[in-house]
């Protein structure tokens, strides 16, 4: 009996040792996998670093590219497109106008009434709709008929409300958030699609004529009287409320900027049609490129798999369309290197399935258990992850968003440097200037709705400029500014006004 007990005890000890060995091996294996994930995070942080010195080098590079783009066509990655806008709203405009805004993920229709004073601006009707994905790869006829039918329904809702004192033909501003080479304030040809649109036969077509043709087919007595880039609309809205506004930036699905430039600095345009001495320039800065940009392997993968590879590199690092997919790619890589996220789901492997608004929700999750992070991961096919993994995801969101926001700030500072509002004198006649109050209008869901992006960008801009200069620079957020501003610009173009030199 004693011998049996000894044998059982020995066997139990062997089993216990075996179990302990397995558990130790599993823990060691788990630690190795976690170390790999931590290593990937560290690599990401290092690749996304944007120290102040690098940002200031980018500011210089942007200012140089701006100058090159003003000298000759094709002389820069920045197109620096003329808009033929040399007068901006000042509050004296009157009348009722419409605007239709085609953005990267939505379109808006608005009706604006102006009574001759800033305080009398009345936005009477607003409709906002998501753009059906099918339209983004359809034909020009389908796209513009859709827009025309939407505008027709909008006007039919008015009934007899349209003022009899207005001309019979309604005036429409078409806000168009894609690169266009303007030939006048009311016409321009499409250069290329961005933000996921791919309607091939549209390149080189006059955008205003396309919309006008669709309106005419439906018997609508509406004249497309202005073709306006969304940034120019935002600048118009900003200037209407604050004459110190000299630039506008959109951070939404994509990103772009415009600003007021002296006409004598626009060397590629020998005879600009302006008497004001200034013209709004549409930068199309999404295509900016510099060796100083902190590009990662995830950016390279995203670019290679996009419909416009080797194009719009800057926009793909700061645009709302792309931030979510960069975060997704990081999580996917970690899933491939480790099992901390469980089995790799087909959902997580799908490009653009993670939207930037979800990144914002995870990044700003203030619940004790990071429940929003857990919910969104579950939607991606990742369930029951421990707290440390949820915190890891928040950190990934932080790294990607912080980089984007700081690069965005460098873009704004580059504009300020070019126009001599960064304290250095820029390309202006005198390096010694008294700092003037400078307003930059900012629009777009990424800036308006993503608090951490906004805070990181504002902080970086202050760091780049320094406190002495930053106190003179005001970044003003505005909602629907590009749509309303386009209607204001249309009203302004109906009267004889000029904008001050910058």
From Swiss-Prot:
Pfam families: Hexokinase_1, Hexokinase_2. The chain crosses the membrane at residues 4-24. GO terms for biological process: glycolytic process; hexose metabolic process; intracellular glucose homeostasis. D-glucose binds at residues 194-195, 229-230, 256, 284, 315. The keyword ATP-binding applies. ADP binds at residues 104-105, 253, 445. Belongs to the hexokinase family. It comes from Arabidopsis thaliana. GO terms for cellular component: mitochondrial outer membrane; mitochondrion. It catalyses: a D-hexose + ATP = a D-hexose 6-phosphate + ADP + H(+); D-fructose + ATP = D-fructose 6-phosphate + ADP + H(+); D-glucose + ATP = D-glucose 6-phosphate + ADP + H(+). One of its GO terms (molecular function) is D-glucose binding. Keywords: ATP-binding, Glycolysis, Kinase, Membrane, Mitochondrion, Mitochondrion outer membrane, Nucleotide-binding, Transferase, Transmembrane, Transmembrane helix. Its EC number is 2.7.1.1. It is found in: Mitochondrion outer membrane. Its main location: mitochondrion. Residues 35-491 form the Hexokinase domain. It is a single-pass membrane protein. This is Hexokinase-4.
């Amino acid at each position: 009996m004693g011998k049996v007990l000894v044998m059982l005890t020995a066997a139990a000890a062997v089993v216990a040792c075996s179990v302990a060995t397995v558990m130790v091996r599993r823990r060691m294996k788990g630690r190795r996998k976690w170390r790999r994930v931590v290593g990937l995070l560290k690599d990401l942080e290092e690749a996304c670093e944007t120290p102040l010195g690098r940002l200031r080098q980018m500011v210089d590079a942007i200012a140089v590219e701006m100058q090159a783009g003003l000298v000759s066509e094709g002389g820069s990655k920045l197109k620096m497109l003329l808009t033929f806008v040399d007068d901006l709203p000042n509050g004296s405009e009157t009348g009722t106008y419409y605007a239709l805004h085609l953005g990267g993920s939505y379109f808006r229709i608005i009706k604006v009434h102006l009574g001759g004073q800033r305080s009398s601006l009345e936005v009477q009707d607003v409709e906002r709709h998501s753009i059906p994905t099918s339209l983004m790869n359809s034909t020009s006829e389908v796209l513009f008929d859709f827009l025309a039918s939407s505008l027709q329904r909008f006007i039919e809702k008015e009934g007899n409300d349209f003022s009899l004192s207005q001309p019979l033909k309604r005036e429409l501003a078409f806000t168009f958030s894609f690169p266009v080479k303007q030939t006048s304030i009311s016409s321009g040809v499409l250069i290329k699609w961005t933000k996921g649109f791919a309607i091939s036969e549209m390149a080189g077509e006059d955008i205003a004529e396309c919309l006008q043709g669709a309106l005419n087919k439906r018997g609508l007595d509406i004249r497309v009287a202005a073709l306006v880039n969304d940034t120019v609309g935002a600048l118009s809205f900003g200037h209407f409320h604050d004459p110190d506004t000299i630039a506008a930036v959109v951070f939404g699905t994509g990103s772009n900027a415009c600003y007021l430039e002296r006409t004598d600095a626009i060397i590629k345009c020998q005879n600009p049609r302006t008497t004001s001495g200034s013209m709004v320039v549409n930068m199309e800065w999404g295509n900016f490129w510099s060796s100083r940009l902190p590009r990662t392997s995830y950016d390279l993968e995203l670019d290679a798999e996009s419909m416009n590879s080797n194009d719009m590199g800057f926009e793909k690092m700061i645009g709302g369309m792309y931030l979510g997919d960069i975060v997704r790619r990081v999580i996917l890589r970690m899933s491939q290197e480790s099992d901390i996220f469980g089995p790799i789901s087909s959902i997580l492997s799908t490009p653009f399935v993670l939207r930037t608004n979800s990144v914002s929700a995870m990044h700003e999750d203030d619940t004790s258990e990071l429940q929003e992070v857990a919910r969104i991961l579950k939607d991606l096919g990742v369930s029951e992850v421990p707290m440390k993994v949820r915190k890891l995801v928040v950190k990934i969101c932080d790294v990607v968003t912080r980089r984007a926001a700081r690069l965005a700030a460098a873009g704004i500072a580059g504009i300020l440097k070019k126009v001599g509002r960064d304290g250095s004198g820029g390309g202006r006649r005198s390096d010694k200037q008294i700092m003037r109050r400078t307003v930059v209008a900012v629009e777009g869901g990424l800036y308006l709705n993503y608090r951490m992006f906004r805070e990181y960008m504002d902080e970086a801009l202050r760091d780049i400029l320094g406190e002495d200069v930053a106190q003179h620079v005001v970044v003003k957020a505005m909602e629907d500014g590009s749509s309303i501003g386009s209607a204001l610009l249309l009203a302004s173009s109906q009267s004889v006004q000029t904008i001050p030199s910058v």
